[in-house]
């Protein structure tokens, strides 16, 4: 047993190191022009199991999956089992602004979570997952005729990359068989690079590069509770709530501007701004959920989340606030999520597809930033299935998220995407004493 725990923890350490290295290699963890603002696009929390139901999970209790969206949900498990969840995500997007169109594809490891029993109705979990992603690469040309008349044509190339990850350690316990509580310690870390290259068609002018190199870290706590009430037969009602505290970021933002001509580099500006005294922070978040469940046959749930970013400082801090002429205003983000799951007959020994779990969901999200006073909203529909594999609760989860971010109104960029998520759910029975020697 001890060796298994050591191997599992060693695997988690290697994965964390691997993620840290890949984050420094410049590969896109996600790609969207909206990630130019602040810390980029905030990743939707949850495994492939949650994402295939619109992202629900605050009131979900399912002993076959690790539901890390609510720390209290870790107690919904077999008391003798070791559990692991590993997820991958493929995103395919098409962008449109006016008559312009483009597209991009990305592939990324999304989450790795382990869970162990502690004592009777208590359990422990540890994992790593992206918190936000930056990935963009676009060009524009100068349109001001006065500037063009003086200097000639100018091309602006902007690109950025980077990720902020969260490592979390949590535990939960159930009391009176109905009321569960949980708490999580979360540590954030990551690097973000943003660069704009200004190139003059007239070679008598020097090219100018402006950019920021951001390195951040911080810690916070998250708390959750769930209350489950039996109604009639196998039907039960579950109420859930979560709260994540605001996070003061530490680290630095290196902001620079230099001009080049031939092999000559002239530094115009170079400053290092230390993040301190809470001038840049992640917003706090509160979430509530309500779910109805019919044993292991069906589950339906509605979740609402709200996060306050208005005082985050993202829209004023150097390196976070803008690239070129792009500006944004930090605001309150919201998310509405509805999802369901149905399993025809989990114990059917004749028809395999009746043992599979089928899921669907919808969501509506409002981003943590406004552009020129306009909200940036996303909406989508999700589908998914879990295919049972081998014995116990092992399974392969497949999910699809079809959605749209923003619209072409107000000269904004419309993003339509299809995201495919894959989750590997692994169970193993530990701590069970052999009946025979």
PLM feature spans:
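Outer-membrane beta-barrel porins/channels
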Residues: 24-52, 117, 121-437
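Bacterial N-terminal signal peptides that target proteins for export
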Residues: 1-10
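Bacterial N-terminal signal peptides
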Residues: 10-18
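N-terminal, post-signal peptide beta-strand-biased segments of exported outer-membrane/organellar beta-barrel
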Residues: 22-132
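Short hydrophobic "helix-edge" motifs at membrane interfaces and signal-peptide entry regions
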Residues: 10, 59-61, 167
């Amino acid at each position: 047993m001890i060796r298994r725990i050591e191997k599992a923890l060693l695997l988690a350490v290697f994965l964390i190191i691997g993620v840290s290295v890949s984050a420094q290699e410049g590969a896109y963890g996600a790609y969207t022009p909206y990630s130019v603002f602040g810390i980029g696009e905030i990743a939707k929390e949850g495994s492939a199991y949650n994402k295939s139901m619109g992202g629900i999970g605050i009131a979900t209790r399912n002993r076959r999956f690790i539901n890390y969206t609510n720390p209290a949900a870790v107690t919904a498990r077999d008391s003798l089992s070791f559990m692991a969840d590993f997820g991958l995500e493929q995103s395919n997007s098409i962008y449109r602004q006016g008559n312009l169109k483009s597209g991009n594809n990305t592939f990324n490891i999304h989450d790795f979570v382990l869970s162990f029993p502690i004592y009777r109705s208590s359990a422990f979990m540890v994992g790593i997952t992206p918190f936000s992603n930056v990935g963009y690469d676009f060009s524009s040309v100068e349109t001001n005729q006065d500037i063009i008349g003086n200097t000639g044509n100018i091309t602006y190339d902007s690109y950025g990359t980077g990720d902020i990850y969260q490592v979390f350690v949590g535990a939960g316990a159930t009391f009176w068989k109905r009321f569960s509580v949980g708490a999580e310690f979360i540590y954030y870390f990551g690097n973000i690079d943003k660069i704009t290259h200004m190139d003059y068609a007239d070679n008598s002018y020097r090219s100018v590069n402006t950019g920021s190199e951001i390195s951040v870290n911080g810690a916070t706590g998250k708390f959750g509770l769930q209350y489950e009430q039996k109604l009639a037969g196998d039907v039960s009602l579950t109420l859930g709530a979560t709260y994540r505290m605001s996070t003061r970021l530490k680290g630095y933002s290196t902001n620079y501007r230099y001009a080049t001509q031939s092999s000559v580099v002239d530094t115009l500006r170079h400053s290092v701004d230390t993040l301190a005294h809470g001038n840049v922070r992640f917003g706090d978040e509160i979430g509530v959920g309500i779910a109805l469940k019919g044993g292991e046959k069906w589950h339906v749930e509605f979740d609402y989340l709200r996060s306050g970013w208005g005082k985050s400082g993202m829209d004023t801090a150097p390196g976070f606030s803008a690239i070129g002429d792009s500006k944004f205003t930090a605001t309150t983000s919201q998310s509405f999520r509805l999802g369901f799951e149905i399993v025809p007959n989990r114990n059917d020994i004749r028809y395999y597809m009746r043992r599979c779990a089928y899921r669907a969901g919808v969501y509506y999200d409002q981003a943590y930033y406004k552009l020129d006073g306009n909200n940036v909203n996303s909406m989508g529909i999700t589908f998914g299935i879990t295919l049972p594999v081998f014995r116990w609760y092992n399974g392969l989860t497949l999910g699809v998220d079809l959605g749209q971010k923003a619209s072409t109104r107000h000269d904004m960029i419309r993003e339509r995407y299809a995201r495919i998520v894959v989750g590997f759910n692994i169970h193993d029975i530990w701590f069970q004493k052999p009946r025979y020697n």
